[in-house]
Amino acid sequence: MLRKGCCVELLLLLVAAELPLGGGCPRDCVCYPAPMTVSCQAHNFAAIPEGIPVDSERVFLQNNRIGLLQPGHFSPAMVTLWIYSNNITYIHPSTFEGFVHLEELDLGDNRQLRTLAPETFQGLVKLHALYLYKCGLSALPAGVFGGLHSLQYLYLQDNHIEYLQDDIFVDLVNLSHLFLHGNKLWSLGPGTFRGLVNLDRLLLHENQLQWVHHKAFHDLRRLTTLFLFNNSLSELQGECLAPLGALEFLRLNGNPWDCGCRARSLWEWLQRFRGSSSAVPCVSPGLRHGQDLKLLRAEDFRNCTGPASPHQIKSHTLTTTDRAARKEHHSPHGPTRSKGHPHGPRPGHRKPGKNCTNPRNRNQISKAGAGKQAPELPDYAPDYQHKFSFDIMPTARPKRKGKCARRTPIRAPSGVQQASSASSLGASLLAWTLGLAVTLR
């Protein structure tokens, strides 16, 4: 009899251990106990639901109508937070203060989230994936990524970012993927990518790039993939690409390339490049329109002396200075840009540094005839797969489909507690235990 009583007590302890702390899930949500996971996706919530257990490590709130994030909404024990595809317009600067365990934060597809405070992500020392795609951002404040030394994946695509300040990514020493495509960037300065010594993939396609400083890619020694297609580049010196010793995949098509003497250094670099590259269709001069720069011969540049003829050097310098001086752009973070330099704010007045491209009027050259995309290098799409699985919880960076894809609904697996039946689940377990106890007695 004593042995039977011990068995009953053991069963009761096991049942109690399986019931989540705090008495259940928020209403209309699904919970999973180990690790504590709360899924409240696609329930039309206008605010963070109440009753999220304090020991929750993973919280999924995507596809709702949540508008604000405030301190106290989440527990510092959280490791993963998905809150993409909501209506977030404001994130209080202290919302994630003390979240030293947070590893993945998905704020993407919140199209009214147009500004971020510099300290929004301060202290997230374990964060390795940050999603800020499709957020309506037009600028990034200085220091917004400060201290994120563990970050490996940063998704900033499909915003309205027009320029990047020097050293904006300088603390991201472990970053491997930087997605900036689908923005409105028109220039890259000497310190834009400074500090990204471990960057593997840089996507800059579908911007409005027309000016690249000759040291823009200086620190990217480990870069293997660079996409610059569908921009407004007419010129890119080989010196810009020289530091990219690990480069394997390069796309330059869809730009209005000038294949005159200015293109000689790029042509020479392409002859030495052993990776895979797209075609580089010429738009000018007229005799070379439609030709591939890669397929030109040394004889095509026999009349070029040095990197460019003296006339071209003079014309290039004047064009850069004059057009940069005429371009008016007001930074949201400070005074207007220095008229002597076409990239972002600069202290004082100085002559423009050596650059790799010639800035042009954005509307001057149409890209319609710039050439077809190379068939061997299709447009890049992130290899996302739906990253939520109750059966095998992800231990490494999850892969996901594009954010515009229809979301796969999450089904409650065996053993999962749902808010609508929390009490009935506990009652059923207790009834079963008591019945077994009666049988044993």
UniProtKB/Swiss-Prot annotation:
Gene3D superfamilies: Ribonuclease Inhibitor (3.80.10.10). LRR repeats lie at residues 55-76, 77-98, 101-123, 126-147, 150-171, 174-195, 198-219, 222-243. Residues 255-306 form the LRRCT domain. GO terms for molecular function: chondroitin sulfate binding; heparin binding; signaling receptor activity. GO terms for cellular component: cell projection; cell surface; extracellular exosome; extracellular matrix; extracellular region; extracellular space; membrane raft; perikaryon. Residues 25-54 form the LRRNT domain. It is found in: Cell membrane; Membrane raft; Perikaryon; Cell projection. Residues 326-353, 397-409 have a biased composition (Basic residues). Residues 421-441 form a propeptide. A lipid is attached at S420 (GPI-anchor amidated serine). It is a lipid-anchor; GPI-anchor. Residues 1-24 form the signal peptide. Residues 355-366 have a biased composition (Polar residues). GO terms for biological process: axon regeneration; corpus callosum development; negative regulation of axon regeneration; negative regulation of neuron projection development. Residues 304-382, 397-417 are annotated as: Disordered. It comes from the Eukaryota. SUPFAM superfamilies: L domain-like. Predominantly expressed in brain. Expressed at lower levels in kidney, lung, mammary gland, placenta, salivary gland, skeletal muscle and spleen. The keyword Cytoplasm does not apply. Keywords: Cell membrane, Cell projection, Glycoprotein, GPI-anchor, Leucine-rich repeat, Lipoprotein, Membrane, Receptor, Repeat, Signal. Belongs to the Nogo receptor family. Identified in a complex that contains RTN4R, RTN4RL1 and NGFR; the interaction depends on the presence of chondroitin sulfate proteoglycans. Does not interact with MAG, OMG and RTN4. Cell surface receptor. Plays a functionally redundant role in postnatal brain development and in regulating axon regeneration in the adult central nervous system. Contributes to normal axon migration across the brain midline and normal formation of the corpus callosum. Protects motoneurons against apoptosis; protection against apoptosis is probably mediated by MAG. Plays a role in inhibiting neurite outgrowth and axon regeneration via its binding to neuronal chondroitin sulfate proteoglycans. Binds heparin. This is Reticulon-4 receptor-like 1. It comes from Homo sapiens (Human).
